[in-house]
Amino acid sequence: MQLLTIGINHHTAPVALRERVAFPLEQIKPALVTFKNVFLGPQAPNTPEAAILSTCNRTELYCATDDRAAREGAVRWLSEYHRIPVDELAPHVYALPQSEAVRHAFRVASGLDSMVLGETQILGQMKDAVRTATEAGALGTYLNQLFQRTFAVAKEVRGTTEIGTQSVSMAAAAVRLAQRIFEKVSDQRVLLIGAGEMIELCATHFAAQGPRELVVANRTAERGQRLAERFNGRAMPLADLPTRMHEFDIIVSCTASTLPIIGLGAVERAVKARRHRPIFMVDLAVPRDIEPEVGKLKDVFLYTVDDLGAIVREGNASRQAAVAQAEAIIETRVQNFMQWLDTRSVVPVIRHMHTQADALRRAEVEKAQKLLARGDDPAAVLEALSQALTNKLIHGPTSALNRVNGADRDSLIDLMRGFYQHAPRSNDQSGH
């Protein structure tokens, strides 16, 4: 079985493409079934395995398969599933085989490949991806072992380095950008759309600035109400957004909607009602919640996750020593995992050897039992049994030695000496 990771992320693709390749949570299980069965070869000697990790910054397919053409098949499947031409998608896709796939998984879970260096949210997202793959019946021995090692490495990296300390989160970056637009965030009205982990982080950071008002709008009213109350804010129905948008100076949105929830027309009306006072908008969702055309309006300052990434990277340089430590830990653990993977490759061979040897044993025992039943001398029967087993067990190695020549034969001889520890060397004339 070969490990393979196929994907795109914030390093290789803009948000405009990432949002088209993202998988809504409810689509992942059925997608895994088609991906595993159609493109990883259901007739393969070993059952193929697959997992999908889809976040705002990356979409990745983790595979374990015998199919040597899995790389091309995975890219083609991703293209067809999302109805994106292969020629448009392929230049942004990375394909990581074997140790590269292992190293990548370890780095992703440890926060080394994130836009926010050392962030912890990705680890929870990977665990969710594994849980979903397990429920879909798409996870097996290889990927299960990979992810368990991945989580252990992430824990080790975060526990022994300072990779996650003083990191600038997306939420903190949003506040910093708001401070560039408005002299005092404390004088502004803030609207947060959504009620997930990212919006919760934004609520924490914006509430710390003491805004004039903090309001949460969410599709599920009860959840939005609970979040608003935690930060002494108010909740409002998401349906009221088009008619009340003009009330807010700062709008941050991050929902799981597959389509934009804030359109150009609604923002145009809000700007007009505000008499062209500026609106600061942050779209942290992938796919995007706010139509990109909104950013072209004169009095609107619209930022996406990619825009916030530049601010986040400013805080990453100071933690390069921790990065070096983390990379060293990861490299050691990659080698450990590859050793385990190598041992797995010989398991079928060992199993076959046991099966063959046992078949020989049973055949000879059955023959011996028949001889004993007809009254043959037990000592002679046992001698014949042992001779037959000896001849048949060494037949394979002997035939192999006779078939090869030159350096191959010398290598095989050395290998056989390892099997039979007491085999005499060719220059040993002692006769022992």
Swiss-Prot record:
Catalytic residues (positions): 56
Domain of life, per lineage: Bacteria
GO biological process per UniProt: protoporphyrinogen IX biosynthetic process from glutamate
Catalytic activity: (S)-4-amino-5-oxopentanoate + tRNA(Glu) + NADP(+) = L-glutamyl-tRNA(Glu) + NADPH + H(+)
SUPFAM superfamilies from the UniProt entry: Glutamyl tRNA-reductase catalytic, N-terminal domain, Glutamyl tRNA-reductase dimerization domain, NAD(P)-binding Rossmann-fold domains
Keyword NADP tagged: yes
InterPro entries linked to this entry: 4pyrrol_synth_GluRdtase, 4pyrrol_synth_GluRdtase_dimer, 4pyrrol_synth_GluRdtase_N, GluRdtase_CS, GluRdtase_dimer_dom_sf, GluRdtase_N_sf, NAD(P)-bd_dom_sf, Shikm_DH/Glu-tRNA_Rdtase
Keyword Hydrolase: no
Binding site for NADP(+): 194-199
Pathway membership: Porphyrin-containing compound metabolism; protoporphyrin-IX biosynthesis; 5-aminolevulinate from L-glutamyl-tRNA(Glu): step 1/2
Annotated transmembrane regions: none
NCBIfam families: hemA (TIGR01035)
Stated role: Catalyzes the NADPH-dependent reduction of glutamyl-tRNA(Glu) to glutamate 1-semialdehyde (GSA).
Family in the record: Belongs to the glutamyl-tRNA reductase family.
Record text on subunit structure and interactions: Homodimer.
Additional facts recorded: During catalysis, the active site Cys acts as a nucleophile attacking the alpha-carbonyl group of tRNA-bound glutamate with the formation of a thioester intermediate between enzyme and glutamate, and the concomitant release of tRNA(Glu). The thioester intermediate is finally reduced by direct hydride transfer from NADPH, to form the product GSA.
Protein name: Glutamyl-tRNA reductase
